[in-house]
Amino acid sequence: MKESTAILALANGTIFKGKSIGAEGQVNGEIVFNTSMSGYQEILTDPSYARQIVTLTYPHIGNTGTNFEDTESEKIWCSGLVIRSLSQTESNWRNEENLSDYLKRNNILGISDIDTRKLTRIIRNEGSQSAAIIAGEDIEEDSAVSLAREFQGLNGLDLAKEVTTKTPYDWTEGTWRGKKANTNFKVAVLDFGIKKNILRILADRGYELRIFPAKTEFEELISINPDGVFLSNGPGDPEPCDYAIDTITKLTERGMPLFGICLGHQLLALSLGGQTSKMKFGHHGANHPVQDLKTQKVAVLSLIHISEPTRPERIGGGGVGGEK
């Protein structure tokens, strides 16, 4: 079978030629890199990557295949996938489909056999930028660069309303090896693009979970008499989400315990008077070392930031300063 060609074009005019490992066609979005060494299926299905083309810095991808359980949502949300090398074999007892077929079945473009170290350095030095992947025959480089430049970035885009659940639902499933704690807390979850594993971990704590759409109003949330409200992860720019900021403000005024992660963390900061600004390049990955300057201990973390100078006084210290 003849291999299809593909190119990745950046808005700065840089071209990478490689092999197509997914669907044929064309797509654009914001290109980012993720430093995780595993979990590529979870990354692909994480709603936080909506409208982004994800570059995996680890060079060898696909060796464990894919399955129908290790997903963070019901579909692939990222616009495209960029890797250095696609494994030609899959070795895992839970494998059900190889990565290439998985991408094709979900109509997602992917490109391999490019210099991902060079690409990552460009993103690191120049910042996240628009990009495009074109896969198939008779690809024109100028057209690919033009397609990349058509994407205007994520600033100002409210993507939470596109990835959120349409109707409320309950969640009880825990992690597959987890043992549920015995608690009686009821938690309302505002879904801005929540990952299933976050819900599983919360369920392991014994929480009674009710998940609500992103635009759920204050009155409906408190109608279930929750002990707290969880503000989920999600994609896009937090500032256009006025509906969520308004609801969160009312919750804080009521004294409701709140916990935000990713987009939810940024929305909580905005509701309390903080500010967010786009980072030069995002800290995507689960393997970022952070040292506690008091204890000298190092933790390996996923990072979420707000601008330290704008941190509201009523938010305690001890977190990691930065930007979104």
Task: Name every feature range the model reports, one short phrase each.
Residues 1-2, 283:
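Short solvent-exposed loop/turn micro-motifs enriched in small/polar/acidic residues
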Residues 2-215, 219, 224, 238:
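RNA-binding accessory domains that recognize and position tRNA/RNA substrates
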Residues 116, 193, 215-217, 264, ...:
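Short, solvent-exposed coil/turn elements at secondary-structure transition points
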Residues 116, 301, 310:
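Ser/Thr-centric signal marking residues that sit
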Residues 205-206, 246-248, 323-324:
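Glycine-rich, phosphate-binding/catalytic loops in enzymes
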Residues 206, 225, 255, 310:
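Conserved functional loop/turn residues at catalytic and ligand-binding sites
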Residues 227-228, 233-304:
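Cysteine-nucleophile active-site neighborhood
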Residues 304-315, 320-324:
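Single conserved hydrophobic/aromatic residue that forms the stacking wall/gate
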